[in-house]
Amino acid sequence: MSVPLAPKKSCFGQLRDHREGAKNNNESILRTGDTNANQIMLEVSSSCDEAKSRDLDDELGNSNLSRPQYHSHFQKEPLHLQGFGKGSQAGSTSQRESQASLTVHRQLSEEHAVKRGALQAPQCVQGPSLSSWRNAVGQASPEASAKKDAEIPRHIPKDKLAKTLDNEELKRASSCSAAAGSVPPTDLQPVQLDTLGPQDHVPARGEGPQRTPASHSPGKGFSPGEGTSEGNSVYLPKPSTSEAKGSSPSDTKMEGPHGLDVYNERITHAELTPSSASASKENPGLRHPEVCLGQGTGKSKVELKSVQPRNEEGLTSAQAQGPGCHEERSMSPVERQELLEKAYREATSQGNSSHRQLGVRRGSSLEEMTGVSAGVEGSQQATPTLSAAPAGEAGTRLTGKMSAGVGRMARETASGQTAPDVGQAAPVRRDPTESVPSEVSGEERRLGSGNSGSTKLLASGPSAGGSRTDTSGLLSPRGSNLEARKGKEMVAENRNLLENAAQTDNTPAGVDSAFSTPAPLLHPETTVNSSHHPTPPGSSSQELGVFSGDTGSPSVASPPTDGGQVLNTSPKVPDRTTCSSGIPKPPTHPKDTPSSQEAREKLETEKMEERAEAKPILMPKPKHVRPKIITYIRRNPQALSQGDASLVPVGLPYAPPTCGMPLPQEEKAASRDLQPSANMYEKLKPDLQKPRVFPSGLMVSGIKPPAHHFSQMSEKFLQEVADHPGKEEFCSPPYTHYEVPPTFYRSAMLLKPQLGLGAMSRLPSTKSRILIASQRSSASAIHPPGSLTTAASFYGSDPSDLKKASNSNAAKASLPKSGLRPPGYSRLPAAKLAAFGFVRSSSISAVPSSQSLDSVQPEQSRPVTRSTFGNEEQAPLKQALPSKDTPKGAGRAAPASSSNATTPRRSLLPAPKSTSTPAGAKKELQKDPEAKKPAVSSPKRTASAATKPHSPGYPKQRTSAPRNEFPPKPDLQAREAERQLAQRLRDRCEWQARQLGLARRELKKAIQGFDALAVSTKHFFGKSERALAKEKELSIELANIRDEVAFNTAKCEKLQKEKETLERRFEEELRRLGWQQQAEVQELQERLQQQFQAESARLQAEHQDQLLRMRCQHQEQVEDITASHEAALLEMENNHTVAITILQDDHDHKVQELMSTHEFEKKELEENFEKLRLTLQDQVDTLTFQSQSLRDRARRFEEALRKTTEEQLEIALAPYQHLEEDMQSLKQVLEMKNQQIHLQEKKIIELEKLVEKNIILEERIQVLQQQNEDLKARIDQNTVVTRQLSEENANLQEYVEKETQEKKRLSRTNEELLWKLQTGDPTSPIKLSPTSPVYRGSSSGPSSPARVSTTPR
C-alpha cells in the first residue's frame, strides 16, 4: 500500500499563498452566482499551483475538519485508486490527469461546499476532493502525481487553449457533461479539466462522461460541445439558483443515459450557472454551453464557462475569464493533457489535504460529487440545492427523475468503461443514455457503488486506468444501465472485491466519496453534512474506487432521492439538497476504508436527513407522528471512522442525517456498508461506549451501538421503510442550522415531567423552536463539529439520566416533540447515529423509526403514548409551520429544524418537519404501513422528495416531494391512527433492531474473539518455537560460558597466589633497600659536611686575599678617575671662560654700534625738528602780522563806525547819553575778549608746537625701545647659551659621578668574581687573575667614557 502523503507544510504555505493570490487576483478562483445562493467558485486550475492553491485552501479549510482517521485511513487505505497505485503510475497520464481534474473539481466543489459551509454550496468539488485525490494519488503514486505536475503546463496561452478546445470541445463536451453531472455547480473551478478532456479521451463514448473527472471543473469540464455528451454546446443564460434548480429537475427528466450527463450538466448548470453566469458575464467568449446535454427531455443548458486553465504566470487574464472554457479551447490536446496532469497532481496533492478536509469542504464537495456521481438525480437535486431556494424544489424534481442508479451506472460505467479504457476512460464517461430510472439507477448505484464501480475500479485498481475509471465512475456516474445492472449482478462479487479492494482502493473511493459527499456542504443547514463530509481519504478513495459502487453510498451519504445519490451536492441549496434522496446507500467500503465509509455514511445520513427534509412532501403520511420504524442502518464502522465520530458531535446539528437507510436499490450496497468491519467497530467502540454518544433514548430503546449492523434483512426493511418517499424524506436530518439539537428540547422535556398531552404545550411553539433551532444551528454551524459534539453532550443529559428520563414521562413527552422518538434517542445527533452506522431512513417514518428505536427500548408501551403526544404535538407544529411560505431559510431549516423542533430532543429526527407539515406527517403515518412494505417506492419519487428539502413543504414530507404544496392536514384521529401505526412499526423495528443488534454484536464479538485468539495463538506459537530454538542456543552458550568461567577462575586464583608471593618479595626487598639507602645517606651526609667545612675555610682565606687586592686596585682606579675628572673639569672651565669672553666682546661691539646709530638718528631728528620749528615760527610771525593788520583795520573801522555812530547817536540819541557809557563798557569788554582770544591763540600755537615735538620724541622713543628690545633679546640668548653650557657642565659632572659609581660597582663585582674564581674549584677554567682583561677593562672602562663624553663637550 502506498504510504499516505501528508500535505507538506511548505506545500500548505505555497498553496495558501497561491490560494490567497488567486483570490486576490481572481486568477485561481472566480466566484459567480449569488453569494446567498451558492457562490460558484470557478477555480481555474490551469496551473498545478492553482490546483495546489485550492488544495491548500481545501486543506486549510478542512485541515481542522480533516480527521487523522481520514488521513490515516485514506493513506492507510493505499490510495489504490485504480490509476493511482503503482498501476496508476503505470496508467496513462491522461487518466491520471482526468482523475486529477476530477479530484480537483471535487475538491473545488468541496472547497466551495466548505466555504459555503453554512449557506453556500461547495464552490468546487475540486478542492478537498482534489486534495483527497492527491492523497490517494500521492500515496499510491506520488511519483505519478509529481510527473503529472511537471507535465501539466502551468501557462497555457488562451489562444492555444481556444484552438485545442475546438477539437477537444466535443470530447470534453461529453466529458464535461459527465463532469457536470459529477461535479455540482460548485465544480465551476476549472481544473484544467479541458486538458483532462484530451487526456481523458472518452474510451468508448464520445459523450465525455469519461471526461467527467476532467470536466469536473465546471468551467473546464464543460467546454462547448463538452457540455453535451453529444457534443452540443449550448450557451445557457446564467440560470438563477432557482433557475438552475428548475432546470435541474427538467434535466432530471432527461433520458436515462443522458440523464446522468444532464444531471451533471444540471448540477453543473445549477452550480455552474451562477458561476458560469458571472463567468459568462465576465467572459462571454469563454462561455461554453459545454454541459448542455440536451439528451434528456430538456438539455440542461448549462452555461458552463469553461474556466480558462490559467497558468499562474501566463493566464492572469483568466481571472475574469476563469469561468470560461475558451482557454481550454485554445489549449492543444497535449497542453490539455498537461493541464489535466497538473490538475491530477493538484488533485492528488489536494487529495491528501482534501481527504483530511473532507470533514467540511470535502463533505460538501464530496456530497456534491457524490450526488453528481451518485446519480443525475442527486446531482440535479444538488443543483437545485446549489440554487438558492428554488434549488430545493428543482433538486427534488431532479432527484425525482435522476436515479441514484444513474450515479451507480456512472460508477459502473466508470469502473467498467474506465477499466477497459484505462488510458482514456480514466474519468468514467457518464452516458446520459445510460442513466436508468431512479430505481434502476438506485440499484445501479448500489451495484456501482457496491460492485460494478467498485469491483471494476478494484479490478483496475492496480492500473492507473482503473483508478481513473474509479474517478470517472465517481465523476461520471453514467455507468450504462446495463453496466449498472451488471454491477447489480456482480454486486455480491463486487461487494467482496470492493470490500477487499475498496480497502486498497479506499482512497480512490474516498475521493469519489469525497466528491459525492460535497453535496451536504452545499447547505448551510447541511453543515452537519459538511462536517460529515470530510470523508477520510480512505472514504474518498473508496468512493473513487467505489464511486461506481460508492457513489451510491456517497449519494446515500448525500442521500440521493433514489439510490442515495445525495445530489444535495448542489451547492445552491446548502441545507436540504444534502438530504437529496431517500436513505443513502451505505458505501460498500471494506473495513479498511472506515473513514470514507463513515464520512459517506455521515454525508449520506445528512443528505438523507436533508432529503427527508426536502422530501417531506413525498411523505404520504399526513400526520407528524413518525412511525417508529427503525431507520438506523448500521453502517460500516469504517464509514464512521472515515466520517470520524468526532466530526459528528453527539449533539452536533451538523450530524449527518440519520436517514442512512439505503433505498431498496441501495439495499445491497447498504447491507454491505451495514456490515461493520471489526476495525471500524474497534474505532467506534470508544465512541459507542461513551455515555454521551448514546443518549438515554438509545440506551433505553436498546438501540445497539453503531458497531452492531442490522442484518441485511433488517437493512432491507429499513431501506424499504426509507424507500417510502416520506420515510426517505424524513431520514432524520442532523440538526439543521435552524434546528435545535434534539437533546436540547429533550433535556428540557426530561427535566419537565411530561403530563399527558399537555406536555406538548410546554414545548416551544414550532416557530419558536425553529428560531431556537436556527440560533442553535447557527451556533453549531459556527462551532466546529467538536464543539457541536460538546453542545450535543450538553444538550443531552448523561445517557443514564436520559434513559431514566426517557423511561419516565420525559420519554413520552419527547415522543410528542419528536414524533415518536424517545428523548434519549433524539439526544444522539444524527451525525453520531450515522457515524455509528445507524442510518435513519430519509422518510418521516425513518424519523419516527429512529424515535421508535429510542422509544422501543425504553418501553414499547410508551410508543403509544408517544404517538399520541407526537400527534398532538405535531399538529400544533404543523400549524406553526403549515405553509411553504415559511422563509426558505426557515423552510429549509424548518424541515430539519421543525423536525428537530418537534423532536428537539431527537436531533436526528426531523420532528419539526412533521410539525411544520402536519399533512406530511400524516402522510408519513399513512406511509408507515408502506414503510413496512419494502421501500419499492420509485427512487424518483424519493429523489424528488429529497430535492424538496428546501421547500417549506419539506417538513410536510408530502409524497409529492417536488411540490411545495402542503397536503391538507388530516384530522387528529387520522394522525392518531398513523401515529399508532408508526408506533407499531417502530416497535417492530426496534425489536428487529435489538435482535439484529444482539446478533451482530454477538457475531462481531465472536469474530473478534476468534480473530484475537487466532492472532494470539499464532503469535505465541511462533514465539514458543523461536524461544525453544533460542533456548537451546543459549543453553549451549551457557555451558561454554560456565567452562570458561571455571577455567578463568582457576587461572585467576593461580595468578592471585603469584601476585601475593610477588608482593611479599617486593615488600622485603623494599625494606632492605630502604635500610641500605638510609645508611648510605648518613655516610654521604657526614662526608659532605667535612668537605664543606674545609672548602669554606679555604674559600674564606682566598676571599680575604682577593678582597685586599681588590681594595688596592679600586683605590688606584679611583685616584686615576679623580685625576682625569679634575683635568676634564679644568679644561671645561677654560673653554667656558673663553666662550664667555668672546660673547661679551660681541655684545659690547653690538651695543656700541646701536648707540652710535641711535646718536646719529637723534641728531637727524633734532635737525629736522629745528627746521620744522623755524618754519612754523615764520608762519606764526606771518600770522601774527596779519592779525595785527586786521586788528588795525578793525580799529580803524571801529573808530569810523564809532564816529559815525556817535554822530548818529548824538543826533538820534541825544536823549540817551548814557548809551555812550554802555558803549564804552562794551568796547572794553570787546577789548578784553580780543585779548583773551589772542592769548588763547598763542597758547594753541605753543601747544601745537609741543604736540609736534612730542610726536617726534615718541618716534625716537619707539626706536630706542626697539633697540633696547633687540639688546635684551641678545642678552637673553646669551643667558640661555650660558645656562645650556652650565647644564651641560652639570650633566658632565653627573656623568662623571655615575661613571665613578659604575667603576666602583664593577670593581666590586670584579673582586667578587675573582674571589669566587680563586675560592672556586682550582680546575675551573672560569677563574681569572686580576690582570685578566676583565680587570683591565673594568679599571680602564670607567675613565674612558668620561673622557670621551667630556671631550666632545
Curated annotation (Swiss-Prot):
Residues 626-964 are annotated as: Mediates interaction with MAPRE1. The lineage of its organism: Eukaryota, Metazoa, Chordata, Craniata, Vertebrata. It is found in: Cytoplasm, Cytoskeleton. Residues 786-1134 are annotated as: Localization to the growing distal tip of microtubules. Keywords: Coiled coil, Cytoplasm, Cytoskeleton, Microtubule, Phosphoprotein. Homodimer. Interacts with KIF2C and MAPRE1; the interaction is direct and probably targets MTUS2 and KIF2C to microtubules. Residues 530-541, 805-818, 893-904, 1332-1353 have a biased composition (Low complexity). Residues 976-1319 form a coiled coil. Binds microtubules. Together with MAPRE1 may target the microtubule depolymerase KIF2C to the plus-end of microtubules. May regulate the dynamics of microtubules at their growing distal tip. Residues 89-101, 239-251, 347-356, 566-581, 853-871 have a biased composition (Polar residues). This is Microtubule-associated tumor suppressor candidate 2 homolog. The keyword Coiled coil applies. It comes from Mus musculus (Mouse). Residues 786-874 are annotated as: Sufficient for interaction with KIF2C. Residues 1-30, 81-101, 125-259, 274-615, 799-823, 847-972, 1315-1353 are annotated as: Disordered. It comes from the Eukaryota. InterPro entries: MTUS1/CCDC69. In the C-terminal section; belongs to the MTUS1 family. GO terms for cellular component: centrosome; cytoplasmic microtubule; intercellular bridge; nucleus. Expressed in heart from early embryonic development onwards. Later during embryonic development, expressed in brain and nervous system, in limb buds and in the epithelium lining the bronchia of the lung. Detected in adult brain, heart and eye, but not detected in other adult tissues examined. GO terms for molecular function: microtubule binding; protein homodimerization activity.
